[in-house]
Amino acid sequence: MPIEETAAAPFTDGTWLLSHNGIVDRGAVGEAFGAESVVDSAILAARIFVSGVQNLGETVRQIGAADPGARLNILAANGNELVATTWGDTLSILEAADGVVVASEPYDDDPSWVDIPDRRLVRVRDGKVEIEGL
């Protein structure tokens, strides 16, 4: 497969930016929904945008059920809100006075980093973190 810009994150619907860290069977995602590339992450992003980022948890549960080996760490942000999932891969958060960091893994030795358990949805808005099970 040739290297192409449309296959690289972040993907956007004009409002949200989205990245996917992991792997998923394209057949488990469903139709391409107008994806600009055939790579799994582009098809997954298109499915999420069609389903609505507000429904990210349900979309991840459906795809995870269809592909038990999927790794679906997704990060979506629109400038006001950040939504992330951990499904089969690591995710950590760091809450600080000047903001919240969400990352695949801690980037330093700060003891304030918190590892998020698998199969969780994380929402960050106005400096507040909410975590719910998937």
Label the model's feature ranges.
Residues 1-134:
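Conserved short alpha-helical segments that host acidic/polar catalytic motifs at enzyme active sites
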